[in-house]
Amino acid sequence: MRLDGQIPDLGRVGVWSWSLVDQPAPQVRRAVAAFEAMGYRAAWFPESRGREAFTTSALILSATERLAAVTGIANIWARDPDAAASGANALGEAWPGRFVLGLGVSHAPSVARRGGDYARPLAKMRDYLGRIEGATFMGPPADPPVPVILAALGPQMLRLAASRTGGAHPYFVPVEHTRIAREALGSGPWLAPEQAVVVASDPGRARELARKHMSGYLRLDNYRRNLLRLGWNEAELEDGGSDAVVDAIVAWGDADTVAERIRQHLAAGADHVGIQVLSDEPFPLNDLEALADRLL
């Protein structure tokens, strides 16, 4: 399987949603059809303990006509490289130009739960990419080839993304990281950070939702190390993050204010931003429509 497939035109923004993997299939079908009707061209989703990544992709693609499914990310510990190449080719052949395979090394606790050893994640990813590239697929090939991107935060994974794949998908990052990532990648590779947002102007309510979202991530070494690299200190990362950390990671305010943060990522070098709306609703369609009106 090739690793240099061209990224389709996904527009400047897409929808990033955990609910695509943890809500019932009928609700997912209705939601992605609504995303497409609003003008979004990409639906992003993770892979952890919810619906499996390739199954989720097929669900999204079968319920829409133009929307792309982008794994953000497919966990490389969840399947061997041959299985990943087979699944990607099958999706790319069935829905040409509408699937992007984002791959990631996950996190030590999740890897341990699967019985793996997280000791050398960069080497693991490098080996995985080589084995995907060498995989033999006996079915009809995807045309165009399925593009591959990497979840990348630190300089070494960003360099690997630039040298071996189509680009990078940083998650849980401020705008400052997008500038750093673009410099590390160079001008060619695709850069698509995720941006969590709360469309609410009350600081207390907005930060409450933000901290609920952030608290688990701030216990994971990968995200903590990245924020420490960016200049925060350990104390600022405790208890769901200081106000300054919260405000850097989660954009909040009215739709105009939130849209401005997305534009800052684009100005900093992003080609595309996956917008994750934090809400009590699984699919906050009104907020997504308000942002679509301002960004699409």
How should these model regions be labeled?
Residues M1-L296:
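Active-site-adjacent structural elements that line small-molecule/cofactor binding pockets in enzymes
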